[in-house]
Amino acid sequence: MNSFGIRFKFTSFGESHGQAIGCVIDGMPAGVKFDFDFLQEMLDKRKPGQNKFSTPRKEEDKAQVLSGVFEGYTTGTPISVLVYNENTRSKDYEKDVFRPAHADFTYYHKYGIRDYRGGGRASARESIARVAAGALAQMLLKEFDIEIMSGVFGVGSIDSKLSNDEFDFNCAKNSEVYALDKNLEQSFKDEILKAKKAKDSIGARVFTRVKNPIKGLGEPLYDKLDSKLAHAIMGVNAVKAIEIGSGIQSSYMYGSQNNDELKDGVFLSNHSGGILGGISNGGFIDIKTYFKPTPSIFLPQQTQNIQGENIIRELKGRHDPCVGIRGSIVVNAMVAICMADALLLNASSNLQNLQRVYGKNK
């Protein structure tokens, strides 16, 4: 639906070419220091039109916080964030034509009506709401020294050979394409521009790490931390697969290779990706996310119109040649939301926690 989370919950609203995109965050505890500059920084990292590796649609994406914050701190009431759309160009979209590999076809057959302008609700423009909610989640996580970092480790046929521990998040922070490998940053850029010049698009791969996760986060059996992360990330536009820890590679291993042995309270490896039995074990939570190529390309393609007629169309509009670049910011936000939700849920997981909250320790 349009909401995500149990205790830390957000609801998003708005369409690509509507008046605004926004979200309402419910469950944020009172007393968390609110950092508006950080919120805007996260939105700026996601916003379009920053360079030639992104869509040429330029939006300022300035956040307006309408409620839930007073004198620099959260009040415990719903926090609403609004971002206005200021640079729409709806004439680029045809009302009766299904764009290949887009949600046009499925939305129409589900609802019998669709907002065709820029993909409407199915547009990645909606991810503004996710990034805003994720920024609030990170403000909460910061109070517990939990840090979430993401970047791009592969574009097209080019993959970094660095290990998870060797990825350079400082490089990603300063890179136009959020590259985790300085030696491949230019190759990533070249690959994107090559696809763009050919009127095509290209896929990408993102790595996310949660540092300092508290042990015990996750709600088995049906709200396991890894299943919630998969749920959250697979809901991001253009994501087709994720891996946690060794992921697919673990299916090629023996148990003796895949098991993370424990000595003196420390795991000697991290094939599990920091999660055992759906619960965090205190190690790094390592996630890889795989983005398909942006479906909006400028080559002739076969499709159909609403009347069922076969037609050939070249798309118009302004689109990312590689959606995974800005998508890395959205994945980071959704991981933060999952971790904040798990943190709050865990507060009532046992009697001792509740006794500490209410000063009833025996």
Curated annotation (Swiss-Prot):
Provide one Gene Ontology cellular component: cytosol
The cofactors it requires, by name, are: FMNH2
Gene Ontology biological process: amino acid biosynthetic process; aromatic amino acid family biosynthetic process; chorismate biosynthetic process
Q: Which UniProt keywords apply?
A: Amino-acid biosynthesis, Aromatic amino acid biosynthesis, FAD, Flavoprotein, FMN, Lyase, NADP
Query: Can you quote the record's cofactor note?
Result: Reduced FMN (FMNH(2)).
Which reactions appear under catalytic activity for this entry?
Answer: 5-O-(1-carboxyvinyl)-3-phosphoshikimate = chorismate + phosphate
Positions binding FMN in this chain are 121-123, 237-238, 277, 292-296, 318
Residues given in the record as NADP(+) binding sites: 46
Q: What Pfam families is this protein classified in?
A: Chorismate_synt (PF01264)
| GO molecular function terms listed in the Swiss-Prot or TrEMBL record | chorismate synthase activity; FMN binding
Q: Which leading EC class covers this enzyme?
A: lyase
What is the E.C. number?
A: 4.2.3.5
- Which InterPro entries does this one have? Chorismate_synth, Chorismate_synth_AroC_sf, Chorismate_synthase_CS
Q: Which CDD domains match?
A: Chorismate_synthase (cd07304)
For this chain, the family text in UniProt reads: Belongs to the chorismate synthase family.
NCBIfam families noted in UniProt:
aroC, PRK05382.1
Assembly state and interactors? Answer: Homotetramer.
What is the role of this chain? This reaction introduces a second double bond into the aromatic ring system.
The cross-references to PANTHER family, in alphabetical order and at most eight, read:
CHORISMATE SYNTHASE
This one is known as Chorismate synthase
Organism of this sequence:
Campylobacter lari (strain RM2100 / D67 / ATCC BAA-1060)
- High-level lineage: Bacteria, Pseudomonadati, Campylobacterota, Epsilonproteobacteria, Campylobacterales
Q: Which gene specifies this protein's sequence?
A: aroC
